[in-house]
Every structure is written in structure tokens, then in C-alpha cells.
Amino acid sequence: MRKSWKTIAILTMIVFVTLCFGVLFVEAQTKIVRRAVDNFVFDNKNHYLPCEKLPTGAEVSRIVQEHRDIIKLIEQVNPGFVGVDIDTAICPGKADLLISYASHRDRVAIESIIGGNTFFGVPYRLQNR
């Protein structure tokens, strides 16, 4: 009887450890937990792209200048509380857009204006501040 309980305990631990590694692997690939926390807890949206996949700072600056009217429209969602910045701090030589806002209503309006997962090909992050 004792050996059977030990066997069950060992098998249970093996299954548990395997499941933990499986969950870690899935999270590393999809970032599903991080996305859920960002979205539902912090009301943020991130692109989770590695630096290699980001455009250069010059490309982002050019696209922002070409679409300055859309940037102004985004900033007018809630003047003084919505900002659009080119972020080059995280990845040297590369950039994305960081759009900050004050409420979920602002976020919904901003997403409606942008209408996709990129701003004319530039990845963006939405941060509720």
C-alpha cells in the first residue's frame, strides 16, 4: 500500500511539473496572461514585439509627420489628457508610438480612430495613466 501511495505522489508531481512547464511555454509564446492583465487590470494595450521587429526611429518620425492630422485627432479625444509620443527609449535605433490616455472611454475612441493594430504600419502601445 505504501508503495502505491508513493507512486501516486510521484506521478502527481511529474504531471504537475509538466503542466507548469507547459503553461510557462504557452505564456512565453502567446503572452496570454500578460495580455489579460494589461487589458483587464490596467486597461493598457501593448504590441509585445521584440526590438528587431520595430521600425527605425526615422521611419516612425516620417509616418507621424505624414499623418499629423490623425495624431491631432487622437490628441483631441481628451485635450490635455491624451498624448502621442515616439518612444525610442526601450530599443536603441528603433521606435514605436506610445499613446497615453486618462480613461477607458478615451481608449475606445483612440482605437476607433486608429482602426487597426498599427498606426499606418507603426506598432503602438496604449497606456492608461
Model-identified regions with their sequence ranges:
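Short, Lys/Arg-rich N-terminal segment immediately upstream of the first membrane anchor
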Residues: 1-6
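Hydrophobic membrane-insertion alpha-helices, especially the h-region
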Residues: 8-27
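N-terminal presequence-like segments and adjacent domain-start helices
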Residues: 21-65
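Short amphipathic alpha-helix segments
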Residues: 59-83
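Solvent-exposed coil/turn segments that connect beta secondary-structure elements
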Residues: 100-104, 115, 129
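Short amphipathic alpha-helices in soluble, non-transmembrane regions
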Residues: 107-117
